């Protein structure tokens, strides 16, 4: 179920402060965050976030197509190692 429109998008307050601080200074640093639940806003376009996936930080460069989605969508938490092979079948 989608979030109510009257509530607006959720973004952690400290994340907005960090982005505004970088915009004022003009620097292009990576913004380290654990907030996978934050929605990507239009002011985030052009910035690079280091999003924590539970093990390490994954760099996420934000572009216009990502606006409205969550930061956690671009930092996968699970690695797929393939399905188990059938041990009865011998390959020739």
Swiss-Prot record:
GO molecular function, one term: structural constituent of ribosome
Record's keyword annotation contains Plastid: no
Pfam name, any one: Ribosomal_S19
Keyword field: Ribonucleoprotein, Ribosomal protein, RNA-binding, rRNA-binding
InterPro entries to which the protein is assigned, alphabetical: Ribosomal_uS19 (IPR002222), Ribosomal_uS19_bac-type (IPR005732), Ribosomal_uS19_CS (IPR020934), Ribosomal_uS19_SF (IPR023575)
One annotated Gene Ontology cellular component of this protein: small ribosomal subunit
SUPFAM superfamilies in alphabetical order: Ribosomal protein S19 (SSF54570)
GO biological process, any: ribosomal small subunit assembly
Tagged with keyword Repressor: no
Family under the similarity heading: Belongs to the universal ribosomal protein uS19 family.
Function as written in the Swiss-Prot or TrEMBL entry: Protein S19 forms a complex with S13 that binds strongly to the 16S ribosomal RNA.
Name of the protein: Small ribosomal subunit protein uS19
UniProt source species: Rickettsia massiliae (strain Mtu5)
